Amino acid sequence: WIMGHMVNAIGQIDEFVNLGANSIETDVSFDDSANPQYTYHGVPCDCGRSCLKWENYNDFLKGLRSATTPGNSKYQSKLVLVVFDLKTGSLYDNQANEAGKKLAKNLLQHYWNNGNNGGRAYIVLSIPDLNHYPLIKGFTDTLTQEGHPELLDKVGYDFSGNDAIGDVANAYKKAGVTGHVWQSDGITNCLLRGLTRVREAVANRDSGKGYINKVYYWTVDKRASTRDALDAGVDGVMTNYPDVITDVMNEAAYKNKFRLATYEDNPWETFKK
């Protein structure tokens, strides 16, 4: 999965997919009442990027729905996975459950079209703080109460705080999550980060008894760091330059080992070599 980083304006969806992304990451900011409000990152952000592009969250969801609904004039068949980077740092811990409820209602109405031929992309809810694990239960309970538990088949989870792997496993246990887990690791492209924890996550994924199904690394913008990530065995790389990742995947060393994921590839299944 080539994951276009910080796709917060509707116009950027086409831009990143046309550069080779089959997945996008979108920032979600919340208001004081835990309502998802804007797709907005703000300053500071990755080097070489504008940090200030934004939409109202519900408007973005409608644009995303158009891009991921077969038959729509804006449909992009390659776009199969969306990571919502939930900026819950602005919330009190006791608002996490409420944020999950409100997120579920927004997605149900504006993305899934109340279960009636909505967008088809798989969704990852990426949470920066382990203490905010109740967001997951708020989300899953609400979709079930609203009569659409089947949509949870399209939803996965990530804790993005680079916490110790054991602590992340514990948070999932508390949240009642037993699958659909992506594990992120990384840092802004302005800084360097080694692959120690990525390798640990990959080992957990491949052990057959860990909690991780997929591993992604961010933010990967250079050919050398792309090769390092692929060599470490990641399932996804998040990037500001999808075309760079595509170029590396076409190199002799990688083109028979890796291919771009399609809609038929289940993002919750651990890949067995």
Curated annotation (Swiss-Prot):
This protein's major location comes to secreted
GO term, biological process aspect, one: killing of cells of another organism
Which cofactors is this protein said to need? Mg(2+)
Q: Which InterPro entries match?
A: PLC-like_Pdiesterase_TIM-brl
Which terms are listed as keywords in the entry? Cytolysis, Dermonecrotic toxin, Disulfide bond, Hemolysis, Lipid degradation, Lipid metabolism, Lyase, Magnesium, Metal-binding, Secreted, Toxin
Q: Could you tell me the EC number(s) of this protein? A: 4.6.1.-
* Intrachain disulfide bonds: C45-C51, C47-C190
So which tissues is this one expressed in? Answer: Expressed by the venom gland.
The compartments listed are: Secreted
Free-text cofactor note: Binds 1 Mg(2+) ion per subunit.
State the active site: H5, H41 (nucleophile)
User: Does Secreted appear among the keywords?
Assistant: yes
The domain of life is: Eukaryota
What this protein catalyses is: an N-(acyl)-sphingosylphosphocholine = an N-(acyl)-sphingosyl-1,3-cyclic phosphate + choline; an N-(acyl)-sphingosylphosphoethanolamine = an N-(acyl)-sphingosyl-1,3-cyclic phosphate + ethanolamine; a 1-acyl-sn-glycero-3-phosphocholine = a 1-acyl-sn-glycero-2,3-cyclic phosphate + choline; a 1-acyl-sn-glycero-3-phosphoethanolamine = a 1-acyl-sn-glycero-2,3-cyclic phosphate + ethanolamine
One protein family per Pfam: GDPD_2
| Molecular function as annotated in GO | lyase activity; metal ion binding; phosphoric diester hydrolase activity; toxin activity
Q: Which GO cellular component term is one of those annotated?
A: extracellular region
Q: Where does Mg(2+) bind?
A: E25, D27, D85
Q: What is the purpose of this protein?
A: Dermonecrotic toxins cleave the phosphodiester linkage between the phosphate and headgroup of certain phospholipids (sphingolipid and lysolipid substrates), forming an alcohol (often choline) and a cyclic phosphate. This toxin acts on sphingomyelin (SM). It may also act on ceramide phosphoethanolamine (CPE), lysophosphatidylcholine (LPC) and lysophosphatidylethanolamine (LPE), but not on lysophosphatidylserine (LPS), and lysophosphatidylglycerol (LPG). It acts by transphosphatidylation, releasing exclusively cyclic phosphate products as second products.
Family membership, please give it.
Answer: Belongs to the arthropod phospholipase D family. Class II subfamily.
Record's protein name: Dermonecrotic toxin LspaSicTox-alphaIA2ii
**Organism the protein comes from:** Loxosceles spadicea (Recluse spider)
Question: Lineage of the source organism?
Answer: Eukaryota, Metazoa, Ecdysozoa, Arthropoda, Chelicerata
